Design a protein with these regions (language model features):
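Central regulatory/effector-binding core of bacterial HTH transcription factors
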Residues: 1-29, 88, 94-95
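Short loop/turn segments at beta->alpha junctions
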Residues: 5, 58, 96-97, 115
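Alpha-to-beta junction loops
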Residues: 12-23, 41, 105-112
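Short secondary-structure boundary segments
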Residues: 25-26, 47, 72, 115-118, ...
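Flexible hinge/capping segments at coil-to-helix
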Residues: 31-41, 45-67, 150-153
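Short beta-strand->loop
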Residues: 32-42, 112-116, 124-138
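Secondary-structure junction motif
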Residues: 65-86, 149-154
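A late-sequence structural motif
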Residues: 126-164
């Protein structure tokens, strides 16, 4: 088992270092990809923040505040979302670690965009709201287009049965 960011995992699959990997669909275009679940993206800010009174948050509203993001390559879905928005955020900090990002947000040093699955581990001291319009990442199991091990196929079947 290897732990890496999306770009590292993708490269490991392509170069045959691993049979398969968990990826977001956004980085799996040259791989065989089996979607497993959709994970909503949310705006995240400290408790007591002015945006906490809203039911949902637009990117332009969020970008009025200093933004803390994951280092490019760690979360390509959010990077892709940022490139689609006509309003450019003021990125104050960029980190590889979710714990560090949430700590900075919790301490009022900025706001961030995160995935609902990640937020389950960091609920204390932060508030999240859905983005408007809604956005999500599609997570799944990716394989090389040329590799197809029995172990990988067994794992895929197990995940499909367990998650769905």
């Amino acid at each position: 088992i290897f732990d890496g960011n999306y770009d590292e995992i993708r490269d490991w699959i392509i170069h045959g270092q691993v049979d398969c990997g968990f990826l977001s669909s956004i980085v799996a275009d040259d791989l065989t990809f089996y979607p497993l679940l959709n994970d909503p993206l949310c705006a995240v800010f400290p408790e007591g923040h002015p945006l906490a009174a809203k039911n949902s948050v637009t990117l332009p509203e969020l970008f009025e505040y200093p933004l803390i993001i994951e280092t490019p390559g760690c979360d390509n879905d959010i990077q892709h979302l940022l490139t689609k928005c006509p309003v450019r955020p003021k990125i104050s900090y960029s980190f590889r670690d979710d714990t560090l990002i949430m700590s900075f947000v919790r301490n009022g040093l900025g706001v961030t965009i995160s995935q609902e699955l990640v937020l389950k581990a960091f609920a204390r001291g932060v508030v999240s709201r859905p983005l408007s319009p809604s956005c999500h990442r599609t997570l799944g199991l990716a394989f090389s287009k040329t590799a197809n091990s029995v172990v990988s196929q067994t794992m895929l079947r197990y995940l499909q049965e367990t998650i769905h």
